[in-house]
A protein has these predicted regions:
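Histone-fold recognition with a strong bias for associated Lys/Arg-rich disordered tails
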Residues: 1-167
Length: 167
């Protein structure tokens, strides 16, 4: 259930996630889908080689191409033909909200980075993604939750991360 106003929630995304969300929305429009989904955003995050997501996948030697392909297959099954502007999927917004709670409460950060989204997705992929994503589900979610800061310290997002309460 969404507790925050979507617009306020999306403003909590860091620059990397905001760019990925913009790319996800553009892909959605290009495919004439009705909703920007978690799969759209996941594909965009997997495409950014300097994000937390890329660094974490690299650390675990996880199958980036497999995850991208699985998400794209899920997208190919979405209803298309939308002549207008798509909306954000409620599941996408819940994913961002849950990542915001994790980022602020557990990481003490002022914005949502892609690693926080990845942690929430790894912990509860079935909640945000209607299709199975074995490459995502194979990540050691509990370890990732505990060690995200350490694992993603070399990402471009880590350098830009600001603690909660920072200007």
């Amino acid at each position: 259930m969404l507790a925050a106003e979507p617009r306020s929630l999306l403003r909590r995304l860091n620059a990397t996630c905001t760019r990925a969300l913009e790319a996800a929305a553009a892909a959605c429009v290009g495919a004439r889908h009705y909703e920007v989904t978690a799969e759209h955003l996941l594909v965009a995050l997997l495409d950014d080689r300097e994000s937390d997501v890329a660094v974490v996948f690299g650390h675990y030697r996880a199958d980036v191409e497999g995850a991208r392909g699985q998400a794209k297959r899920a997208l190919s099954s979405l209803r298309d033909g939308n002549p207008g502007k798509p909306v954000f999927s409620p599941l996408l917004l819940e994913w961002v909200q849950d990542a915001w709670v994790y980022a602020s409460a557990e990481l003490g950060e002022a914005s949502v980075r892609s690693g926080a989204l990845l942690v929430r997705a790894a912990l509860a992929a079935g909640r945000y993604f209607p299709s199975e994503l074995p490459a995502l589900e194979a990540l050691p979610s509990d370890e990732l939750r505990r060690r995200l800061g350490e694992l993603a310290r070399t990402s471009a997002e880590a350098a830009a991360a600001a603690p909660a309460g920072a200007p």
